[in-house]
Every structure is written in structure tokens, then in C-alpha cells.
Amino acid sequence: MQKIAGVKGMNDLLPGDAPLWEHFDNAVRSMLRAYGYQQIRTPIVEQTQLFVRGIGEVTDIVEKEMYSFTDALNGEQLTMRPEGTAAAVRAVIEHNLLYDGPKRLWYTGPMFRHEKPQRGRYRQFHQVGVEALGFAGPDIDAEVILMCQRLWDDLGLVGLKLELNSLGQAEERAAHRADLIKYLEGFQDILDEDSKRRLYTNPLRVLDTKNPALQEMAAGAPKLIDYLGEESCAHFEGVQKLLKANNIPFTINPRLVRGLDYYNLTVFEWTTDKLGAQGTVAGGGRYDPLIEQIGGKPAPACGWAMGVERIIELLREENLAPEPQGSDVYIVHQGDEAQVQALVAAERLRDAGLDVILHASAEGRNGSFKSQFKRADASGAAYAVIIGDDEVASGVVQIKPLRGDPNADAQQTVPSDQLVDRLIDAMVANSD
């Protein structure tokens, strides 16, 4: 029978890769605890209109990349979430989470976009994101950026570059938009099809081009930062001042606009030159209009999302993957009664907090002690516990160090009822 393959662009996480993901996850959770953020979990599937209204009807995500379908039971238009912010904000509004004041929230999980799979860009991908809701000052903009820097430090990542821009407020963007359209109309003969399509619907996105032929044109375009009013300038200067005070280097990029329509004021991206074209590993900014757009009472908001797969790849690229950790104990056994005692011993050791692999029979055969020891050594376990019929008859077990112990060849026989204490003593002595 023909094998059924996975969906292209939706990848399996295999056991050999899981420790690095767990390492990243632990670092993220530790950092988030340090800043007082609380986790929120939302469904993978949401109403399509949430993303149309929240992300923007003329964005690439909504126009071309969403996995949407009609619910056969009730005809609802549903979408597998392409990003996490709109869903988190929907949950905040629906459950009235801001009733008692601002909130610091975070989420993690798979996102889905229908696009051509390539390095660093997948149809199912994972994000970690934070949402700081109800905070209006530049201090929270700086805080969410500092969170990223702390995570890079905790993971050992260096060389990531921070780019900043301000998109100002709606009226400032409107004035800039009018002048920008006039400017771009003079280049219609060189605009590609995407740029022509965006010219009158989302002209800011024309500037965010990766097309080398258009980058010179984009460099000469009117800069939104020159249209900022006094309050927007003060906010942006406040963010910069706080970053400088914390020794965070950054570059102001007037063409940085992000791919989602809900941003205003501060936007930022963290980038690397080590992942090819998909060099953005995290990005975010302020999105004060979004809560009202989705149906809530107006409230300021700021946050970011980072691509987990890209950071995992960067950790591998930089040889920052942690050393594999084996179990504490591998139990080998031979004989029917020994099998029973081995299972009892394994549970006692687990009760004491140890990680234990119990050798299990394959195809009805338990294998010789020699073959079991090969598996024990390959497992990475620190100690083997040996139980055979002779040990059962004598009420003892044997403990053999497999690695790390200077007396690695020393095998000791201990009473069965002392196994836990003697093994823990050996592990403590070996760790000194």
C-alpha cells in the first residue's frame, strides 16, 4: 500500500529535534516570568472576519495566504489563524479582561499561511508573542524590545540587529499617503504587479519591497517620519531614549512598515544575516487602533511575535544547541520474576524523582544482557540497574555506572530495598 506523506510545508517535530525546541521553550518561559506576563491560549480556528478586520483586507495575508473554509454545519466562514495578535485581542474583548486594568499577556502555538514553502517560511509555523494591553507610554514599547534582547542573551545569540520606525497616527499617515501616491504614480512604468496593485490600497507596502529594481525608487520616496506631529515625535524619541539608557543599539529604518495594517507609532524588527532571505526573527510594535477595530473599547496596545523555527535554525547555525541529556537510569533484566521486580524498581526510582528507562521486550524477546547493555549505553543513561533471576533470589540488584563516574567499571551489589538511597548517593558523589 502506498505511503501517505505529510503536507508540504507542514513539518514533523522529531525526537532528535525536540530537546532544542524544549530548550528554547524553557528560555522563553523563564524570560516571560521575569517580566510578569501571563499566558493566554486561543483556538486555532477563528471567524474569518476577525482577520479581515484586524489584519487588513488588502494585506498579503488576507488576500492570498489564509487557510479559510466554510463550516458545513452552519455556513460560518472560518480561518486557521495566520497570526496570534488578533485572536488574543478578540479573547481579551470577549472575556472583558481589561475590566480591572492593563494586562501583560503571552501566547505560543502553530500558525498557518498558504504560501510557497522555503527556508524559514512554512505553511504551518510556530510563534511566540506578547501583548501588553492598556499601556500608552513609550516605556512599554521599550520593555517589549528589551524582552527580546534578554531572550537573545539567555540563548547566547549575538549579532541580531534592531530596526525601528514610527508610523505615527492616522491623520499623519493620511497626509503622507497622499504625497506618497503622487510620488509613486511617477514610477508606474517600473512598478511590478504587486506594487501596482497596492498603489492605491496600501502604498506604504510598496516601499517595503524586496525587489532590487524598486529599492532605489523606495529610497527617494517621502518618509513617513517627516510627517510625524509633536506627540508622535515625542513618543518615538521616548522609546529611543529608553533603549539608549539600556545600551540597546538600533537603526532607524524609515521604510520599515510591517505587513499588518493594525500598527501605529512604534514598529520594530530584529533581523539576522545568517538565515538568507528570511532574516526577520521577531517583529512588532504598537497597535492602538486594533482593540476598537475588533469591537472593544479603545485601549492602547503593544507587542511582538517571533518565529520559532527561524530562531531554532539560528541556534543550530550558531552551534548553540544544548548537549543531549540522557536518563538517570536504564534497567536491564532477564527472567520472568526479574521482569516483575524491574518494573517495581523502576516505579520506586521514578517516585524518588529519577528519570528511568525500563528495557522492554521487542517482538516477544527480551534480548541478552549484552544486547540490553548496548541499548543502555546508547540511551545516554548515567547508570544501569541489573536484575536477573540470581539477583531476585538473593534480594539484591546491581548498579553499574555507564559514564561520568571515575570508577565507571565499578559495579556494586546492593540490597533491593536500598536501591533508591544507594543510587542517589552514587549520583550525588559523581556530581561533586
Swiss-Prot record:
Annotated localization: Cytoplasm
UniProt keyword annotations, A-Z: Aminoacyl-tRNA synthetase, ATP-binding, Cytoplasm, Ligase, Nucleotide-binding, Protein biosynthesis
GO biological process, one term: histidyl-tRNA aminoacylation
A GO molecular function held by the record: ATP binding
Pfam families for this protein: HGTP_anticodon, tRNA-synt_His
Subunit structure: Homodimer.
Name of the protein this chain belongs to: Histidine--tRNA ligase
Species: Ralstonia nicotianae (strain ATCC BAA-1114 / GMI1000)
Lineage summary: Bacteria, Pseudomonadati, Pseudomonadota, Betaproteobacteria, Burkholderiales
